[in-house]
Every structure is written in C-alpha cells, then in structure tokens.
From Swiss-Prot:
The lineage of its organism: Eukaryota, Metazoa, Chordata, Craniata, Vertebrata. Component of the CERF-1 ISWI chromatin remodeling complex (also called the CECR2-containing remodeling factor (CERF) complex) at least composed of CECR2 and SMARCA1. Component of the CERF-5 ISWI chromatin remodeling complex at least composed of CECR2 and SMARCA5/SNF2H. LUZP1 is detected as part of the CERF-1 and CERF-5 complexes in embryonic stem (ES) cells where it is involved in complex stabilization but is not detected in the complexes in the testis. Interacts (via C-terminus) with LIMA1/EPLIN; both proteins restrict ciliation and may work together to regulate this process. Keywords: Acetylation, Actin-binding, Cell junction, Cell projection, Centromere, Chromosome, Coiled coil, Cytoplasm, Cytoskeleton, Microtubule, Nucleus, Phosphoprotein, Tight junction. It comes from Mus musculus. InterPro entries: Cortactin-Actin_Reg. This is Leucine zipper protein 1. Residues 251-292, 375-402, 432-558, 677-700, 782-829, 924-945, 959-995, 1033-1068 are annotated as: Disordered.
Amino acid sequence: MAELTNYKDAASNRHLRFKLQSLSRRLDELEEATKNLQRAEDELLDLQDKVIQAEGSDSSTLAEIEVLRQRVLKIEGKDEEIKRAEDLCHTMKEKLEEEENLTRELKSEIERLQKRMVDLEKLEEALSRSKNECSQLCLSLNEERNLTKKISSELEMLRVKVKELESSEDRLDKTEQSLVSELEKLKSLTLSFVNERKYLNEKEKENEKIIKELTQKLEQNKKMNRDHMRNASTFLERNDLRIEDGISSTLSSKESKRKGSLDYLKQVENETRDKSENEKNRNQEDNKVKDLNQEIEKLKTQIKHFESLEEELKKMRAKNNDLQDNYLTELNRNRSLASQLEEIKLQVRKQKELGNGDIEGEDAFLLGRGRHERTKLKGHGSEASVSKHTSRELSPQHKRERLRNREFALSNEHYSLSSKQASSPVFTNKRAAKASNMGMGTDSGTQETKRTEDRFAPGSSHSEGKRGREQPSVLSRYPPAAQEHTKVWKGAPKPGTESGLKGKVEKTTRTFSDSTHVSVPNDIVGKGDKTSDLSSEAHCGKRGQVPGHASQGTQAVESSCSKAIGALSSSQKASSEGLSKGKKTANGLAADANFSNSKAPILSKYPYSSRSQENILQGFSLPNKEGVDQPVAVVMEDSSQHEALRCRVIKSSGREKPDSDDDLDIESFVTAKLVNTTITPEPEPKPQPNSREKVKSRGGTRTALFENDKNAAIENDSVKPTRPSSNAIEFPDANCAGVKNQRPFSPREALRSRAIIKPVIIDKDVKKIMGGSGTEVVLEKQKSTSKSVTSKVTSSITIYPSDSSGPRAVPSEAPRERHTSTSNIQVGPPELTAISNHVSSPLELSIHKHDITLQLTEAERVGDGSPKNRAEMVVSRSSILIKPSESVEKNSHVPPAETIRWKSHSASSDSRHITVRNAWKSKRDLKCSEDPPTGIGRNMEATNAYTQRPCTDFLELEQPRSQPSEQGARRVGNSGDAPELSPRRTQSSLTASEVLTRRDRMGGAITAASCNHSSSMEEGEDSTFVTSRRIHNPLEHSELPGKQGLPEPEPVWTEERLHPAKPYAEED
C-alpha cells in the first residue's frame, strides 16, 4: 500500500511540475508581449510629435510641389497620345497586308470552282438521260404487275367456286340424312305430346277438385268462426278473406294460364298436322327443309312451354300445401281465441256478480295481495259516450268495481303465471309473433269503430275493455266517496301496417299502462327497505310480465316499478279523440307497455312503433291557496317523423298544506298511449279544499297530463275534494285507495281544446318518509350507507326552469339552457350496509321509446318564495343498462367513486362515440356542507333475493346530491327476440321547494323522472338505435327550511348508448 501511495504521490508531483513549467513559460511570453507593446506605444508617440512639427513648417513647399505635379501630368498626357497614333499606324499596315493575301487566295479558288462547274454540267446531262430510261422501265413493270393480279384473282375465284360446289354436295347429303332422322323424331315427339296433354288434363281436373274442396272448407270455416270473429278479433276474418282472395286469385290466374297454354298447344298441333299434310303434297326439297326447321322450332317452344307448366303445377301444389297449413293454424287460433273469450266472459260475469258484494275487506286484501289496477280497453265508439266517462267522482259502486278489478287482475295473473309455466318463452314469442303478424294489414279504421279488441297472447294477460264501457252512476259525479275510485282508460291499439293507416281517419288510441297502485303500510314505510317489502308483497305486479321471468323476484321488481299512480284521468274524452281523428299515428302499430313478452315481437317488427307506444305523463296537481286552479297550457311541437318531441307545460302553483296523517311512499308511474290532442282549456275556479284535501308537500311536484284532465294531485293521505271540478288525481292514505280522476273543464272546453301529444314516458317516484323526532339519527345512518343504482337513461332531456306563474314566484327569472350530451353513465354504488345482504346483479332496462317528454312544475312554495321548476325531458329511442358495481366494504361511509363510461354501439355511419363529463350548472347556495348525503337507500327485496342496490352520491360534496329514488330492477327474459317490458323507477332531481311543510319530517320528496315503457326493439335484427341526450338547465333551487337543509337536487345522470336490439340475459 505504501508503494502505491508513493507511486501516486510521485505521479502527482510530476504532473504539478509540468504545470509549473507551462505556467512559467506563459508568464515569460506575456512579459515579452508587454515589452513590445510599450515599444510600439513609444514609437507612436514619437511619430505623432513629428507629424505635428512637419505640418507647421512645410506648407509653402507643398503648394509648389502640387503645381509641378500638374505640369508633369499634362506632358505625360501628350506623350501617351503620340504613342497611340504610332500604334494605330502599325496596325493599319498589318491589316492591309493580310487583305492582299486574302484576295490572292480568293482568285485561285474562283478558278478551281469554274473547272468543277463544267464537270457538273456534264454529269447532269448524263443523269437526265438515265431518268428517262428509268421512267419507261417503271411503266412497263406496273403493267406487268396489274396483269399478274388479275390472273391470280381469277384463279382464286375458280378455286372458291370449286369448294362451294363440293360443300354444297356434302350439305345436300347431310340434309337428306338429317331430314330422315328429324322426321322420325317428330313422330315420336307428337306421340309424347299427346300423352302429356292427356296427363295435364287429368292434373287440371284434380287441381280444380282440390280448389273446390279448399273453397268449401274456407266457407265452412267462415261460417263456424263468424260469431267468434264478431266478438273477439275481426282481423282474423280479414286474414281469412285475404287468404281466400289470394287463393282464388292465384288459382284463377293459373287456370287461365293453363287454359291459354293448352289452347296454344292445340293450335300448334293443328298447324303441324296441316303442314305435315302439305309436306306430303310438296315435292321440292328446299321447301320441305324450311318447313321442317320451322316445325322443329315450334316443337322446341312447345317443350319449353310444357316445362314451365310443370313448374307452375309444382308451385301450385306447394301453395296448396301452404294454404292447408295456414287453414289449420287459423283453426287453431280461432279455437284458442274462442276459449279465451269464454274465459273472459266468465270473469266478467264473476265481476258483475261481485258488484253487489261488500267492500269491507278491501284494505286487508290490498295490503296482503298488493294493489292491481289494470288498464281497460276503451272502445272509440262515439264522443258523446266517451264524454260521459270523462268526469266522475267516486261512488260506492265504483268502490265495488275497484275491488272487482283487483280480483280480476289476480285471477288474470294466475292465468298468466300458469301459461308462463306451460309454454316456454321462445315458443310463446314465436306463436304470439305469428298470430300478431297475421293481422297486421287489417283495416284499423273500421276496427276501431266496430269494437274494442281484446289484446292478449297466451303468455300475457290483459284486462278487458268491457268494464271500461260501464257507465258511471249519477252518484259517481258527487264527492262523498270520490277518493276511492281509479278509472284508467286504455284505447285498444289496433294492429295495422303503416300504409293501411295513411289513408284512414284514425281515432286516437290511447293506452295507459297497467297502473298498479300499492300503498305501503306505515311500519314498512319507516324502514329503509320500504319498496322491497312492497315488491315482495305485491307478488303479482304487472300482468304483462315477460314469460321468461319465471321467478317471483323479477315479478316483484316489475310490480314495484309499475306500482304507481298510473291513472291518466278518465277524462281523456271524446274531445281529445274527435279532434285527433284526422291525426294519423306515426306508426301503424301502437302497443302497450303492458303487452307481454310474447306479444312484443309485433312491435319489434316496426322500428317506429315505439314512438306511439306509450305516452306517460304523471301529474301532481295541488289546489291553490285561494282555491283557484290555474289553467294548464300544453303545447306539443310536432317535428318531422316524430323524431323530436317538445312539450311545454305551464301550470299554476298551489299552496300546499301539511296533513297530520302518516306519510306514504307513493310511486307514481303513468304510461300513456299516443294521444293527439292540443289542450287549451280555460281555468275553472275550484272551491276551497277541505282539511282532508290538503296535499302532502312531499308529493307536491306537478306535471301536466297530456289530456284534458291535465292536473293530477298525488295525495298521500285520503283526500276528499268538495267539487268534482278539482282536477286532481289523489291518492288516499287511509284505505290505500287508488287514484281519483276528476274533470277539470267543461265538455265544451274539452271539445274546443286540442292537444297533439307524441310519446311521453314519465316515471315518478314520490318518496315519503315517515317523520318523527327520533328518525333523524336513523336518517343519518341510512344516508351514510345509502345506495342507489344510477339510472342509465338513454334520452334527450331538456330541463327549463319553469315560468313563474304563482303569486310568490320570481317573475324575472329567465330560463337557462344547457345542452349536455351524455351516454352510458355508470356510477359505482356506495358500500353495502352491514345490516342487509345485497346481491350485486346487472340490470338491463331497454327503452324503445322514440320520444319521451317530461315536464315538472313545482307548485310548492317555501316561506321566502321560490320559482317553480319545469323539467322537460325528451328521451329518444334507447336502451338502458343498469349495472350495479361489485359490493364494496360494509360499514364504510366513504362516498362511492364515480365512474362514467361512454359506450356507443352502432352500425350506422353517424354513430358517435361521445364522452361527456359531469358538468352540471347548478346553484350552490342551497348546498349544506355539513349535510351527509341525504339519499336513503331503499332496498328492494324480491322473493328470490334478487335485489337492487341503489346508489345516490353522484358528485361528492362538489354538487348537490340528488335524492335517490326507488330503482326498478328489470330482468331480461331468456328469449332472444322478445323485447322486454322495462318498468322501472329511476333517480331524479329533487325539488327542494317541496320541503316547506315537512320541517318535522326527515325525508325529501323525490320525483323520479324515468322512462318506463315496453322496449319494442327490432326482433331479429342487429339494428341499433342512436340515442342522444340533451340536458337543459337543471332545476332551480328554493330555499330550505331552517331545521332541515335538504341538499340541492341534482339531475339524474342518464346514459346514452347505441344498444343492439337483442336484450341481454341477466345474471341473478
């Protein structure tokens, strides 16, 4: 080591020595440079001194020197001119000498050229002579060539003539042989044609017999089925008639063709016979050859004709077989329809027998079994008869009718369940599609005037229209028992092709989907899983459930979705019909949301049928403080091809008064058929509402129904209006009774009014939470663990702040618009509660509505006064996919992460893949930072533990939280081609102004604007639907009461995605 260190030291010392030497050298160089610089400076200074001295002394000598210089320059200039002249002289001499030499050379060249000229002249003379000789030789050659050509052409002509003669001899030999053979063939062909003619005549006779038998069978079938056709389905008669017409037309046309072909054959044979006789008389071979060729051609045409006749016979046999099959299927259909008619008649008789019974066990029956209000078929017979139904208060008879309706609904549901077990969903779908397609081309105009059509397939169950025709009693128009009655009218949708509908005056078919109203008991309402108990109790749900959903759980889920006030008022009267008679539905096919899955393929074959399927508008009407209800103006803007629908509803606000009764969860859900009416009614004064008529503030959101009966008030407690003119649909609380339909306007006003309504789907959840002093703690616990599934709604939503029409409304508030295009929003739900067991399952809700318009106007006023809010939602044809994310840690109160995924599945060229972030423009003044999320998860418990987990927190503390509404879980049936009924209730923006009178209660009213309709998607197609969503200005916020600060309502995020037509099978 020491050596290494020494070596390193030595090396470093050397290096330092070299550096010192180099630095010393540089210093020496620098010193020398400084010395040189100093010397130069000294010399410069000396020179400067000398110059200064010389300038002072030599000025005179310099002037003399300049004069001398000028003289010298002049002398030098003269010398230069002399030198130039001498140079010029020398050059001139040289040039002259050169020119003399050139002239001598030119002379010599001229002499040479002259000699050559003489030689060339001699050559030219010789060339001219030779040219003359050559020209003579060329002429002689050309003459010889022409002669040789003539001779060769003559030789070729002779050769061709010889060949022609030889070929003609050969041809004559061949033609003689061919004529002999063809004559033999003709003899054999004539024999075969005679045999075939006999065979064809026999076949014709057999076919005529078959045709006669078929016509006799069809006539017998018509006679057998006339009674059934009159009562149940005239479209079957029309199909039979069309079948008969098709048979007769095709058979007659083919008989005529056959007869014409046989006549032609006879003529051809006569001609051939005549020609054969003439041939015997003729002796010239050429004529015989021509005739034989013509006969051969004619016989070939005959052969082709016979082949075509054989093909036609084969086709006729196939068509006869098809007609026989169709005949058998029609017989089976007629039998099934007859059996169904008998069952319906028996059920109607049972209902009529039950009409005299008591109604005492109604409440227990409703709570135990669930409430099943069924939509009824209403015939469009005459406007006067319909107007009788329009305004009615409830009477004891109507109470009995409601009880009968419920029992009939239960019996129908048992029938549907048995039919579901009996038939597989694919089979029922195919059979229903086949049965429905037979009547697609039928005349919708005459059908509507004749009768109401019972609309149900074997797998589905629909309520009948006979009870819809029952005339209300006189007592029904008076208020004492008015709150008990719910009357839902459903116009029978008439199948028909679009072309069939174009030429016809079509009465408006209005279908209001099954409105199953379930009132929740108070003990259930207090719990966090109110709707789950309801869904488990009301096991029957909607009757139009998909056959594929064999499990009770999905039925309960659908029932919980459809449990809502669906009663569009029965006062959708003749005025709305009569004014809309000229109005054609955009699609020939309008179908219920309640059609069972087996009947949905009818809709799926018509891509635009969904526009007219359901118009759902749920309205809550609140009586004014002064007792006067403001007019409702609904203006529908009809865009081309029903692509976009905009509806503006202006409703007056009413003062709400809290009632002392317990709150109930009211899920209001209405589906309405396409109603073509424009309503411009005039206000009618309403009397002062009595104490029971006070509307709960929680259910106070009002939307205008698109009918003459536009105002509907959902009242949680039993409400007794004093006048039938109060336009409200009210839910009584005490007896869990249904909706009361009232006439807002006189029939004259209704006749004057018009409303053109395109498909509207509104699903409202009005959630009432029973309040007490002790519920606040429970509420916070539930808020921390609240879960709600984000509703993925494919829709176009336009939300405007409503026009301020109330006395305390802010008049100068201008509506702000905000367009947000969203699609496929998936929000992860918060953690599961430690108490309840949740099964995370994907849900798919498919919406096939082309246009959905929602309008919300809040009539409630807080103490300071707040503007009414109007939400307008246009939902285009779409599919909704709700997939709750996997369950996360229990007991964790962290708000859920929000994941937004945009999916755009489309085969169309203009499909767009859009990603839009959550950008909601909302007022922050109502935001309470200390408030936990107010969403209260409502656990849905189905019988098969198929539960839906709600998710509430959309934006954690950045945006006001929306109240979670009940999420409807929908399962897609196993059948691939069957569109599903997708009733569900989704989250919606909470109107905070409703909180005025609920300071002592903890829950917030929730209006869920959701799209609930049957998704009649394309059946076997992979066609996808492009859906767009526009979100206009979110609802404006009103001030909260002092004690309870409800967070500001947040519009529901909805999903827009291009969804393939086939539904997905969901996991349980």
